[in-house]
């Protein structure tokens, strides 16, 4: 195999390797996929203001997330059904995250159970949660995550209904017959019904609670002592409500551009959320991160860290655990280089003054 020199190269290799239905499920966005492209392109419009003649012989990328020390501000986002990409699926991802000294977030809709992932490797892990119509299912899932040593809940709040993913409709996407949503196997909810469009869309419509509201965020705090990250915040208004609801943190996310098309890129929403958060809780970002330079830009705009999704899936498909390890190492190396060339020796030294955004350029043009 030709030497892989950046994260994005894994996607083309994964496209060649995976069945079309599975590649399309991982790669596609909602409707026209404008937001899918914008998640990447918005990063390219942010430029650097590097500082020079600073001793960068030693660089420290370590950080703390919700009280847990990790090696770098790059973590793994929840991505469903990873055994479609590789036979070891989430177990390989967990081992790679552990080796890198960072956090993995396990999807509710994983093809490995919370118990299996806990046994795969030591490490700090978060559990992503959808709220089901049957709240007893939610209680059981949260309890199992607690017993399996998970350290936080990432509550997905942008999916009262599944976005219109036309590739999945064309492919009549369904979980391959040899796989099951392991966390739901004992509840007889581990399989999706065959339909004329997307099996996942039908599953969400039948199981996920459309009435989910901010009162449920408070309810969740009554059934667990784990900190709750609200995943899917994109506005100041919802940031204010997240703070008021007692959330421990926010993940600025548009669900990988898979829900509502024509929403802004997450990097374009980040500053609005950070400004409203006012340091009362940490703000994280996912969506479109493919380079260490992207990580630096997010940190400069106020993020406490980033989560990556598709790069993990594509590298997992190509080379299993070793692929995920390589993606994490490449992003780490690129971030370290960006810090050195920008004159930063620690994450605390990365400031808003290190980047120029579209809004900066507009402001300057009016002066």
From Swiss-Prot:
Site positions per UniProt: Involved in determining the substrate specificity of glycolate oxidase: 109
Protein name: Glycolate oxidase 3
UniProt: glyoxylate binding residues: 25, 130, 165, 255, 258
Metabolic or biological pathway, per its Swiss-Prot or TrEMBL entry: Photosynthesis; photorespiration; glycine from 2-phosphoglycolate: step 2/3
Co-factor: note: Binds 1 FMN per subunit.
Alphabetical keyword list: Flavoprotein, FMN, Glycolate pathway, Oxidoreductase, Peroxisome, Photorespiration
Keyword Oxidoreductase set for record: yes
Family: Belongs to the FMN-dependent alpha-hydroxy acid dehydrogenase family.
One GO BP: response to other organism
Catalytic activity entry: glycolate + O2 = glyoxylate + H2O2
Residue positions binding FMN: 78-80, 107, 128-130, 156, 231, 253, 286-290, 309-310
Annotated ranges, domain FMN hydroxy acid dehydrogenase: 1-360
Function (record text): Catalyzes the oxidation of glycolate to glyoxylate, with a reduction of O2 to H2O2. Is a key enzyme in photorespiration in green plants.
Keyword Oxidoreductase: yes
Assembly description: Homotetramer.
Lineage, broadest ranks: Eukaryota, Viridiplantae, Streptophyta, Embryophyta, Tracheophyta
Species, as recorded: Oryza sativa subsp. japonica (Rice)
């Amino acid at each position: 195999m030709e030497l892989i020199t950046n994260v994005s190269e894994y996607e083309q290799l994964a496209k060649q390797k995976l069945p079309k239905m599975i590649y399309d499920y991982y790669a596609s966005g909602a409707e026209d996929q404008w937001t899918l492209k914008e998640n990447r392109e918005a990063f390219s419009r942010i430029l650097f203001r590097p500082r020079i003649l600073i001793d960068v012989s030693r660089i420290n990328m370590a950080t703390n997330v919700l009280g847990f020390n990790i090696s770098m501000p790059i973590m793994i986002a929840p991505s469903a059904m990873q055994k479609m990409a590789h036979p070891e699926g989430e177990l390989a991802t967990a081992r790679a995250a552990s080796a890198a000294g960072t956090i993995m977030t396990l999807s509710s809709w994983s093809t490995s159970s919370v118990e299996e992932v806990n046994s795969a490797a030591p490490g700090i892990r978060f559990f992503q949660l959808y709220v089901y119509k049957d709240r007893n299912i939610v209680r059981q899932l949260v309890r199992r995550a607690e017993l399996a040593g998970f350290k936080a809940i990432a509550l997905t709040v942008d999916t009262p209904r599944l976005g219109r993913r036309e590739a999945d409709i064309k492919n009549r996407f369904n979980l391959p017959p040899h796989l099951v949503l392991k966390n739901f196997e004992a509840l007889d909810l581990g399989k999706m019904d065959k339909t004329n469009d997307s099996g996942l869309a039908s599953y969400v419509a039948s199981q996920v609670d459309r009435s989910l509201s901010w009162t449920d965020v408070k309810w969740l705090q009554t059934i667990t002592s784990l900190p709750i990250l609200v995943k899917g915040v994109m506005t100041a208004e919802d940031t204010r409500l997240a703070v008021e609801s007692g959330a421990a943190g926010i993940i600025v996310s548009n669900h990988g551009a898979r829900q509502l098309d024509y929403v802004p890129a997450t990097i374009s929403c980040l500053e609005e959320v950070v400004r409203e958060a006012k340091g009362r809780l940490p703000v994280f970002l996912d969506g479109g991160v493919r380079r260490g330079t992207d990580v630096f830009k997010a940190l400069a705009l106020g993020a406490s860290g980033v989560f990556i999704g598709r790069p993990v899936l594509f590298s997992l498909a190509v080379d299993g655990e070793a692929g995920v390890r390589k993606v994490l190492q490449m992003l780490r190396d690129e971030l370290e280089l960006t810090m050195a060339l920008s004159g930063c020796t620690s994450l605390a030294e990365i400031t808003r003054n290190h980047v120029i955004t579209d809004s900066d350029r507009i402001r300057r043009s009016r002066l």
